[in-house]
Amino acid sequence: MKLGLLGGTFNPIHLAHLRIAEEAREAAGLDQVLFIPAADPPHKPLAGDVSFELRAAMVQRAIAANPAFRFSDIEAHRAGKSYTVDTLTALRTARPGDELHFIIGSDSFLELGLWHRYADIFPLASLIVLERPEKAITEPLQQLPELVRDQFVQEAGNLVRHSSGTSIRFVIGTRLDISSSQLRERVARQQSIRYLVPPEIESFITQKGLYQP
């Protein structure tokens, strides 16, 4: 199975998350996309005091109508920070027959050199990098961390190949300027988030009283 992996705090999940997953699925011919909420994100504190259970519930509601989208709570079962390399290692062990494709945005791709044990990520999974139309990455090899650059070769089109056989695929995505922080701020100011999140998520946030000042 070609399995896409989309991680994040999903605090809350919104329409841009869903569109990213759909465009990655279509571009790479993925069979499924696994949504993986971070239990303890390493790079920034979790805003809004919203538990893993509540964020997980929102993800499950948001993806329920799409049979290609699945939920994983794998990071809730591991102590410590939710490092990508640890999650990929666990998934590689649990699903040895699957072809893993980790989905990230172009901003995250350009910061890979700052990630925990980033060099160990590339043999574990291919990457699908969703680019903004106005910020397409040119010369992708030059944007890779210098310490691993010689492990990659440029192939035809939008593909870069790692020496282990995995790849990095660059996909121009639809521009949807929606962020979870923006949504939290709107809720706190009593402003509408309709058409920025699925209806089920808007209702859930209201029912649970999330993101109130």
Curated annotation (Swiss-Prot):
It is an enzyme of class 2 (transferase). GO terms for biological process: NAD biosynthetic process. Keywords: ATP-binding, NAD, Nucleotide-binding, Nucleotidyltransferase, Pyridine nucleotide biosynthesis, Transferase. It comes from the Bacteria. It holds the Pfam family CTP_transf_like. The keyword Metal-binding does not apply. Its EC number is 2.7.7.18. Catalyzes the reversible adenylation of nicotinate mononucleotide (NaMN) to nicotinic acid adenine dinucleotide (NaAD). This is Probable nicotinate-nucleotide adenylyltransferase. It comes from Trichlorobacter lovleyi (strain ATCC BAA-1151 / DSM 17278 / SZ).
